[in-house]
């Protein structure tokens, strides 16, 4: 017997317009209706379980109907419970209480808000143990540890370990230390005490918790105090002390320190008084830039490339002030001779042509502009001079051979070329002479006697001259022994020749590179002398000066 009565089938038939349904037909349709309802409900329960829910909804039934290729029932998508009312005049007849909706109200109703797009937003949970006060982070007052009594009361349920966020709490001593350093940097009233504070800042081992506070303090004061020259100098001294402290791990804070240092290097104006020596501040900042790149350039590979790009853009921009050009030149010069040779000397001639009108007192009437131009000119001269000085020191000129060597070489030696086809040593000597030393020299460019960089004398090889006639009392070997000895001597001679050939090729390549670099240095020296005249001569060492003159 079906749980669906035949009266239900008759009511459903009447609701769809079938009025002549026989009772026998309704009785036979009831079991089939029950089977179909059970089938749909089983599929709906599967949809509910796949959705990780325990409450069956109308959407689950719609999903089950779609799986059975049956058109879903419309008008029952509400998430709330259905309300049924009893039909008047019928004891067991119920219907859903549908609220009548006017089309005018539906049309005039405002549109709902568009749903937000799915996105991922990153924010800091904690910075150096301190939770930032941003809307994404819950305030610390809301998260509290549960009371011990409540934990003991919940013996049946699982215990939950609530961990509070780590709060970065500075000790009272560190707070006073930071405040004192900041006051000394701002007040500038006690220079001896400030120097002692800088020494402590560069050597104390317990100052790492203060590094984020110092970096923020330096960044804020540099951006707001460009007119205070003494404050900027004090801040740069703090940066140097932090860099010199071996107990501070400052790599994560370089991205905050570098903008402040570069600002003090290439800013248009530092200080608001004529007596402020901002040139010294720029030199100090250039030394800091060099220190940072040398110490942390291997850790941050893009650090020096980004810095040089910034400095080159400041140098080659004609709209920048001469003070900015000076800072860029000092910063590039502090990065080494290679940077100077590639970035400054390659642009030296066109830049000097643009700087020349500023150096002329007849064309430039502003004395301050003339002074700034001469400062830039001096910075370029110093950078180029130190570059050529270091270049010439790497490749010193070869000393001339001694007179005794030249005198002996007239009768006893020859200059041997490094050509692979000319590897044998020839010695012009009489057969009755005792064993002697043969001189081996290698030809450099233009027929000059080439030696190693250390300037040592030509290499000497002891090779005794063998007599053609053996002694009378010597024992003559057999024919087989003579053949084996001949083979061994030939193999040894072949190995010696191969090793000598490889050494000669290597020496030739080294000497060719040395002569090429030396020739480039000579050309560079001539070019700098054409641009600067006799002003470049004090940077040339005395030995190279004599060769150049």
UniProtKB/Swiss-Prot annotation:
Ranges of Basic and acidic residues composition bias in the record:
489-501
What is one term from the GO cellular component aspect held by the record? SLIK (SAGA-like) complex
Which GO BP terms apply?
A: pollen tube growth; transcription initiation at RNA polymerase II promoter
UniProt keyword list: Activator, Nucleus, Phosphoprotein, Transcription, Transcription regulation
Give the tissue specificity.
Expressed in roots, leaves, inflorescences and siliques.
User: Where in this protein does the record say Phosphoserine is found?
Assistant: 434
Q: What is its main location?
A: nucleus
Where is the segment annotated Disordered?
399-501
Respond yes or no to whether keyword Phosphoprotein is given for this record: yes
| Gene Ontology molecular function, alphabetical | protein heterodimerization activity; RNA polymerase II general transcription initiation factor activity
> Any keyword Transcription?
yes
One Pfam family here: TAF6_C
Phenotype of the disrupted gene, per the record:
Lethal when homozygote. Reduced pollen tube growth when heterozygote.
Q: Where is the composition biased (Low complexity)?
A: 467-482
Supply the CDD domains for this chain.
Answer: HFD_TAF6, TAF6C
Family annotation (InterPro entries)? ARM-type_fold, Histone-fold, TAF6, TAF6_C, TAF6_C_sf, TAF_TATA-bd_Histone-like_dom
The record's annotation in SUPFAM superfamilies points to:
ARM repeat (SSF48371), Histone-fold (SSF47113)
Q: Where is the composition biased (Polar residues)?
A: 427-436
Write down the superkingdom of origin.
Eukaryota
Q: Where is the Histone-fold domain?
A: 5-78
Question: According to its UniProt entry, what is the function of this protein?
Answer: TAFs are components of the transcription factor IID (TFIID) complex that is essential for mediating regulation of RNA polymerase transcription. Required for proper pollen function. May stabilize the interaction of TFIID with selected promoters. Not redundant with TAF6B.
Q: Which family would the database say this protein is a member of?
A: Belongs to the TAF6 family.
Q: What quaternary arrangement does the UniProt entry report?
A: Component of the TFIID complex. TFIID is composed of TATA binding protein (TBP) and a number of TBP-associated factors (TAFs) whose MWs range from 14-217 kDa.
Name of the protein in question? Transcription initiation factor TFIID subunit 6
Q: Which organism is it from?
A: Arabidopsis thaliana (Mouse-ear cress)
């Amino acid at each position: 017997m079906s749980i669906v009565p035949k009266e239900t089938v008759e009511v459903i038939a009447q609701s769809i317009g079938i009025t002549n349904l026989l009772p026998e037909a309704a009785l036979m349709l009831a079991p089939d209706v029950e089977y179909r309802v059970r089938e749909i409900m089983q599929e709906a329960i599967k949809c509910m379980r796949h959705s990780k829910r325990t409450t069956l909804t109308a959407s689950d039934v719609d999903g089950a109907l779609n799986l059975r290729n049956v058109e879903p029932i419309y008008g029952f998508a509400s998430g709330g419970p259905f309300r049924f009312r009893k039909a008047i005049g019928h004891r067991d007849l119920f219907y859903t209480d549908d609220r009548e909706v006017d089309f005018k109200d539906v049309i005039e109703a405002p549109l709902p808000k568009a749903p937000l797009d799915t996105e991922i937003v990153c924010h800091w949970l904690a910075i150096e143990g301190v939770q930032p006060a941003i809307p994404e982070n819950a305030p610390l007052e809301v998260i509290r540890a549960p009371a011990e009594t409540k934990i003991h009361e919940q013996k049946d349920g699982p215990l939950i370990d609530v961990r509070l966020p780590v709060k970065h709490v500075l000790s009272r001593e560190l707070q006073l230390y930071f405040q004192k350093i900041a006051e000394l940097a701002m007040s500038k009233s006690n220079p001896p005490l400030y120097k002692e504070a800088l020494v402590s800042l560069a050597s104390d081992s317990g100052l790492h918790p203060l590094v984020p506070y110092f970096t923020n303090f330096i960044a804020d004061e540099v951006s707001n105090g460009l007119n205070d020259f003494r404050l900027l100098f004090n801040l740069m001294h703090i940066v140097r002390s932090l860099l010199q402290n071996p107990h501070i791990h400052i790599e994560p804070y370089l991205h905050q320190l570098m903008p402040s240092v570069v600002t003090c290097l290439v800013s248009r104006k530092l200080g608001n008084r004529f007596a402020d020596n901002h040139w010294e501040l720029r030199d100090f900042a250039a030394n800091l830039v060099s220190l940072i790149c040398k110490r942390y350039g291997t850790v941050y590979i893009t650090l020096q490339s980004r810095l040089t790009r910034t400095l080159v853009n400041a140098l080659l921009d004609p709209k920048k002030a001469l003070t900015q050009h000076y800072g860029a030149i000092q910063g590039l010069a502090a990065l080494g001779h290679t940077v100077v040779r590639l970035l400054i000397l390659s642009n030296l001639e066109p830049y000097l042509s643009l700087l020349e009108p500023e150096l002329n007192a007849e064309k430039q009437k502003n004395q301050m502009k003339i002074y700034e131009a001469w400062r830039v000119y001096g910075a370029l001269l110093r950078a180029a001079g130190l570059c050529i000085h270091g270049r010439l020191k790497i490749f010193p000129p070869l000393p001339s051979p001694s007179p005794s060597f030249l005198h002996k070489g007239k009768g006893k030696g020859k200059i041997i070329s490094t050509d692979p086809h000319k590897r044998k040593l020839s010695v012009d000597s009489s057969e009755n002479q005792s064993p002697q030393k043969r001189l081996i020299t290698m030809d450099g460019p233009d027929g000059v006697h080439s030696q190693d960089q250390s300037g040592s004398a030509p290499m000497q090889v002891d090779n005794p001259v063998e007599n053609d006639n053996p002694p009378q009392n010597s024992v003559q070997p057999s024919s087989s022994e003579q053949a084996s000895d001949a083979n061994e001597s030939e193999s040894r001679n072949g190995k010696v020749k191969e090793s000598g050939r490889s050494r000669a090729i290597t020496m030739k390549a080294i000497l060719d590179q040395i002569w090429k670099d030396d020739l480039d240095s000579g050309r560079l020296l001539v070019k700098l002398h054409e641009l600067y005249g006799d002003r470049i001569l004090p940077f040339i060492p005395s030995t190279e000066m004599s060769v150049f003159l």
